[in-house]
A protein has these predicted regions:
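Enriched for short, Lys/Arg-rich terminal
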Residues: 7, 57-62, 66-87
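Arg/Lys-rich, positively charged N-terminal/basic patches that mediate binding to nucleic acids
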Residues: 1-27
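Generic secondary-structure boundary/loop-capping signal
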Residues: 17, 37, 42, 75, ...
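Conserved short hydrophobic interaction patches
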Residues: 27-30, 81
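A short, surface-exposed loop/turn module that caps and links secondary-structure elements
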Residues: 30-55
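Intrinsically disordered, low-complexity serine/threonine-rich segments
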Residues: 12, 34, 58-59
Length: 87
């Protein structure tokens, strides 16, 4: 599984607290093994963001991503629920 990171994702990630960064790393490990592990609550987005998917880092934080090629994804953004309005 290859994961690519957009500059937007990297910029938002740098601003997160250390606790959220650690949780995100753990969820990324789970994601690499199984995109649809129930602990991630992976879901497809709707409306203008229907090409994107998201999974939960914790109750408030999400990672938005897009499937890319056969065995890779692009992490687009990370943040609280307000990131949905950017799509």
């Amino acid at each position: 599984m290859l994961i690519y990171y957009t500059s937007e994702f990297s910029r938002r990630y740098k601003r997160l607290s250390q606790d959220i960064k650690e949780q995100a790393k753990e969820k990324e490990k789970i994601f690499c093994k199984n995109h649809f592990d129930p602990r991630l609550k992976t879901h497809k987005l709707n409306g203008t963001a229907s090409n994107y998917w998201a999974f939960s880092v914790d109750y408030n934080y999400r990672i938005i991503f897009k499937f890319y090629e056969k065995n890779s994804v692009i992490f687009i953004a990370i943040g609280d629920h307000s990131i949905y309005k950017d799509f």
